[in-house]
Regions:
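Glycine-rich, acidic loop segments that terminate in or are immediately followed by a histidine
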Residues: 1, 21, 52-168
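Acidic catalytic cores of enzymes that act on phosphate-bearing nucleotides/polynucleotides
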Residues: 1-57
């Protein structure tokens, strides 16, 4: 997630001294970046609750390479309603990187984030997919508002369909 996988490989192979020192520096920077992102998340207006989803607007503050980590941390924190999945996004050039997390209870009610993000991101000129409980996508940044509205509606429809079928 930092673009420095080679450092981890060298340390795992037994390299020490300068390599280990550099790896520790990268780890410290990564932790500081995560802490900054978590501080940002606690600000008013960064999280927005829609009808069926909770949106985390990472903008250009949350690093696109960390949006999935931040989404996982927040979704497991117990601070969000368990009745709605978290949809986090961050700017990635002219694209937006999206990371979605659901609760086990939502998956049991029929929510499949991987299927929804795969279908919707393709409709918006992007790509996406994943698992029922955790998924990701990338779409053009100028389409994010409409995408989130459609995703909010689609999550509601998917959950309602399963409840209507006696699954919830």
């Amino acid at each position: 997630k930092t673009g420095n996988a080679w450092l981890g490989i060298l340390v795992a192979m037994g390299a020490r001294s300068d390599v280990l020192e550099e790896a520790q520096g990268v780890l410290e920077q990564y932790r500081a970046s995560l802490a900054k992102a978590m501080d940002y998340v606690s600000r008013p207006g960064v999280m927005e609750e829609l009808n069926n989803i909770v949106v985390l607007k990472g903008g250009d503050v949350i690093d696109e390479r960390q949006v999935s980590s931040i989404a996982s941390i927040i979704s497991s924190s117990g601070l969000l309603p368990t009745s709605k999945p978290l949809i986090a996004f961050a700017q990635a050039g002219n694209m937006v990187k999206i990371s979605a997390r659901a609760t086990k209870q939502l998956v049991e009610k029929g929510l499949n984030l991987g299927a929804l993000l795969s279908r919707l991101s393709a409709e918006y000129g992007g790509k996406g997919g994943g698992h029922n409980i955790a998924a990701g996508a990338e779409i053009p940044s100028d389409r994010i508002i409409r995408f989130l509205a459609d995703l909010d509606r689609a999550v509601g429809e998917q959950l309602a369909k399963n409840v209507g079928a006696g699954g919830g």
